[in-house]
Structures are given as C-alpha cells and as structure tokens.
C-alpha cells in the first residue's frame, strides 16, 4: 500500500467515523437522520454500485465459490459462538450469535479492495457479501427476535417465527437486483460507457462517507468498555 492509498483509507474510513462520533457528541444529528443515511446507502448507493461493478465482472464458474464460502463462514462462526455463550442471558446470547454471523464486509472490504485493486475487486467483495446481506434479513433478524422473546418469556421458551416474503421483498434487497442487472448487461455483452469509471470512483468516496458516518454516530465507548470488562 503506497502513501496515496493509505491516505485514502484514512480519509474515507476513519474521518467519517470520527465525524459521526463528533456529530453525536455535539447533538448535530438525530437518530432519524442517521437511520436515513444508512437506508440511502443500502437502497440507492449499493444498488447503483453493484450494477456498475458487476457490469464488467467476467462470468466465470469459479466465482461461485465466493458466495458459498461466505455462507460457510457465517454458519461456522455462529455455530461456534452459540455454545460459548450458552450460560449468558438470552439477550446477550442473541447479540453474540448474530454478531458472530455477520461482518461489515460489503462496505469496509469493498472500499479497501477498490482502493488497492480497482473496480473488479469491489465486485468480488460484493459476491462474498451478498449472501450475508440475505442472511441478515432471513436468519439474523428472526434470531434476534427469537432470543429477545425468550428473554422476556416465562421459562425462556419462544417460537422462531419469520415471514420470508416480508423479509426478502423489501427495498433493502435492491442491491441484489442491481447485481443481477449488471450481470445481465455483462451476459448480453452491452458495452459500458467510458465515463462510468470516473463516476464509480466518485461514488466510492461518497458511499464511504454515507456508510461510515452513521457507524461513528452509533459508537458508544462507555457501553463498549462495559462489555469488554465482562469478556
């Protein structure tokens, strides 16, 4: 990594984190605005960037290993965490199992991959990240509700319920649609305009700030140290 790439990582990752934390401390941003930024990132920016990056992704069979490995990693991590935290409260169990299952791969790794290796690297990362995005709504959300219900029930018993249609067919899954459109354009050999490369480069920096500013906003060092002492 050269100095320019290192500076870009600092500017696009740590600066928005610090900005979000500062905005919260100064009360210059509300939680509603923070949630709005996160929704805009997931629904609009990720969809457009997936479409543009997958437009130039070479269609190769071995790329199927990326989503398969992503699913394997998520299930192994959650499976290893579940027995380790079984003696804690149901709420803490749910928190740890869901946290072990998911990772901020799509945003952080996507941006770093683009900075280091270019636009194709961003697409490769999204191939790995998309299964985790689907798992988040199909499995992680129901699991979180399940553990929360067990924590509030008598005897710690609660059913695991979810509506697959309501979970999958939401605006938050538009990123997958963008990916499929991009792959379709690649499949039918539609040439991508040259100006898109510069446009994508601009979107990477915008998306970094839109994505990481809310993360910085939600950082709570006091609660983090509390759980660190428990660990």
How does the language model describe each region?
Residues 1-231:
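Alpha-helical transmembrane segments of multi-pass small-molecule/ion transporters
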């Amino acid at each position: 990594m050269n100095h320019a790439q290192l500076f870009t990582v600092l500017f696009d990752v740590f600066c928005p984190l610090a900005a979000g934390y500062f905005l919260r401390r100064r009360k210059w941003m509300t939680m509603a605005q923070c949630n709005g930024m996160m929704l805009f990132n997931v629904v609009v920016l990720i969809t457009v960037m997936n479409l543009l990056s997958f437009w130039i992704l070479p269609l190769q069979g071995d790329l199927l290993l990326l989503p398969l490995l992503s699913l394997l990693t998520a299930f192994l991590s959650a499976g290893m965490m579940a027995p380790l935290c079984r003696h804690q409260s149901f709420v803490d169990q749910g928190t740890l199992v869901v946290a072990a299952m998911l990772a901020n791969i799509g945003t952080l790794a996507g941006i770093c991959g683009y900075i280091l290796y270019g636009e194709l690297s961003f697409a490769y990362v999204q191939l790995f990240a998309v299964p985790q995005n689907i798992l988040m709504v199909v499995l992680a959300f129901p699991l979180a509700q399940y553990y929360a219900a067990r924590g509030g029930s008598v005897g710690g018993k609660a059913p695991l319920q979810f509506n697959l249609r309501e979970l999958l067919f939401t605006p938050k899954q538009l990123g997958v649609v963008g990916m499929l459109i991009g792959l379709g354009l690649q499949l039918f050999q539609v040439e991508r305009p040259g100006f898109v490369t510069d446009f994508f480069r601009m979107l990477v920096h915008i998306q970094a700030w839109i994505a990481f500013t809310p993360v910085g906003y939600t950082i709570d060092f006091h609660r983090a140290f509390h759980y660190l002492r428990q660990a």
